[in-house]
Amino acid sequence: RYRAATGREPTVLLEPDPPGWLTGTLRLAGWDPASCVEWAGAPARVDRLVVPLHRNRYFTPRDGQFADDFNPAPGDVRWLADRMQSNVPDLDAGEFSPRVFLSRRDTATRPVANEDAVRETLEPLGFESYALGEMAVADQVRLFANAETVVAPHGAGLVNVIHATDATVVELFPEDKVEPYYFCLARQLGFDYHWSVYPTREEAMVVDTGDLRATVSRALDG
């Protein structure tokens, strides 16, 4: 909209040595990462600063505003999803399961201590395990565009639900990291949302597989 209204091409600032998921996302959203500027956060002077209309307030449940203040605009979310999907060929190729479990085997933060048991619990229900860090951004878009049910430990990979059409989300929280971000995102998109909280041991979440089976079964029946 800024470009259409002003005829100016805004400069996008990136962190130094940006990760592949970031450059891949920019490329699918229509920006060439090569035309962006890497900025380490040092003091800088700009002639014109563009401030987006929709800004989100970050908070924790302890603020007492768990559900109401983190409200990404649905129109903005859909705009980004539509723009990215328009640049992904074979979006409906059908190569991924519509029942998705997001593994954390590709990250050192907030691992699942008994992930093998979690996977064995979900497989009879038709779920397949995917590690997003091992997938190209375009494949992540394809995965979520065809997803019907997503079971995932709390983590940034759940942002990809913006590519789903009508999904059910089951979020698994470690007891020391209960945050509202993806509940609010799912709510804004009109998705069914379920959650469970589990204890941690040495910074790894320990999932009660009996509770998980019951929670996911309720979600599938809903």
Can you describe what each PLM-predicted range is?
Residues 1-222:
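The feature primarily captures lumenal catalytic ectodomains
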